A protein has these predicted regions:
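Terminal helices and disordered tails flanking the catalytic cores of nucleotide-processing hydrolases
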Residues: 215, 223-378
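Sequence-structural signature of the catalytic-core scaffold of metal-dependent phosphohydrolases
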Residues: 1-40, 47-271
């Protein structure tokens, strides 16, 4: 909420408004209203997250549901309506800004609403991403996620979108969050911080396997293997409730989630058996799947896990205004931004019971499995 407020105050400062987008900026009274709505949207943006956040979401909600839809339901709930009434804020304005155009399908976004939602959920400069990088790096005790957020925010501007092939003239009058040329190094630092946090922390193989064990536990424990979408039940289900049940399950061999709970509580998690390399990718684009299938045949499906992930929303193309007033694509102004890698992982894990035997098997068979594309359809 604090970062969203800072961005809003900077980009609506009359001295910072580009002439081509001045017409979309509301009058002063409306500016005060939209500042309140934006702050509440930033505060409510993650209301719909399940216990332990993203770890549980993909396979543990009924079809058609995700945390953005749950967020919308919570914002619109009867419990929240008195708050919006007291604040003189329309709940639908809060909902739109909180989840953005990709997840709010009930009406179109005008240019102003699109910019405000971009402040929160934007791929390049969304404050949700700024916040979790800074927060997570602090609490984990690493420096990967740090960048100069104050310098970056001070140089943000609303600018017309620009096509990379159009070097001097904007490709569209549609506005987007961009940056002054003087802030380009801060933007580079943000995007590199995101890359390093994903490659070194979020996608670390041990962290990922605990997500898998947690998901397996929840599937075995929750009624029907999914979370309820009832607002009342959702609010009652917290991290503490899950942790308490997991601790209980780890001590009870008859509990349906015993095996997964024990992996977490006793730190006997599955171990990394295979991690795809660039060389493997050149030989077989589905090398991880091939190893997984072969390992399942050798050791049994219950002893093997497969985990893949490709980073989404690079959001590297944004407008940059030069000191002489010309507007360029970020990709033409920064080789660093152009070349930030996309994080992609492909892991195969083995149970501790089979680890030694599996490592010997891997040494003898890995090259053949990858080269022969064993069990993988073309």
């Amino acid at each position: 909420m604090e970062l969203a407020s800072r961005v809003y105050d900077v980009i609506t400062d009359p001295d910072n408004i580009h002439e081509s987008v001045r017409s979309i900026i509301p009058r002063k009274f409306d500016l005060e209203y939209w500042r309140r709505a934006l702050r509440m949207a930033a505060l409510c943006h993650d209301l719909g997250h399940l216990p332990f956040s993203h770890a549980a979401e993909r396979d543990l909600l009924p079809a058609g549901w995700d945390h953005e839809r749950l967020t919308l339901e919570l914002i619109r709930s009867g419990e929240m309506e008195p708050i919006w009434t007291a604040m003189k804020v329309n709940s639908e304005d809060v909902a739109k800004l909180a989840v953005g155009p990709k997840h709010y399908k009930d009406s179109r976004f005008d240019d102003w609403e699109a910019i405000l939602s971009e402040i929160i959920v934007g791929d390049a400069f969304g404050v949700d991403r700024m916040d979790y990088l800074l927060r997570d790096s602090h609490h984990i005790g690493v420096a990967y996620g740090r960048f100069d957020q104050y310098r970056l925010i001070d140089t943000l501007r609303i600018l017309p979108k620009v096509d990379r092939t159009s070097e001097e003239e904007p490709g569209s009058q549609e506005p987007a969050l961009g940056i002054e040329e003087g802030g380009i190094h801060s933007a580079e630092a943000l995007l590199l911080a995101r890359y390093f946090m994903f490659s070194q922390v979020y996608c670390h193989h041990v962290r990922r396997i605990y997500d898998i064990h947690l998901k397996d536990f929840l599937k075995s424990w929750l009624p029907g293997g999914v979370f309820s979408t009832s607002i009342e039940e959702l609010l009652r289900m917290t991290d503490s409730e899950v942790t308490q049940e997991l601790s209980k399950a780890a001590r009870d061999e008859n509990h349906p989630g015993f095996d997964s709970a024990r992996c977490i509580a006793k730190r006997v998690h599955f171990r990394l058996l295979y991690q795809r390399t660039r060389e493997d990718l050149e030989k077989n684009r589905e090398s991880g799947k091939a190893v997984f299938i072969a390992a399942c045949k050798e050791f049994g499906e219950s002893e093997v896990r497969h985990d893949t992930y490709i980073q989404k929303g690079s959001g590297l193309n944004f407008p940059v205004i030069a000191r002489d007033g010309r507007i360029f694509s970020s990709l033409s102004r920064s080789e660093t931004i152009e070349k930030v890698p996309v994080v992609a992982i492909d892991y195969v894990y083995i149970s501790p019971v089979c680890r030694k035997r599996a490592e010997t098997w891997r040494e003898k068979n890995l090259t053949r499995i990858i080269s022969s594309k064993e069990g993988v359809e073309e």
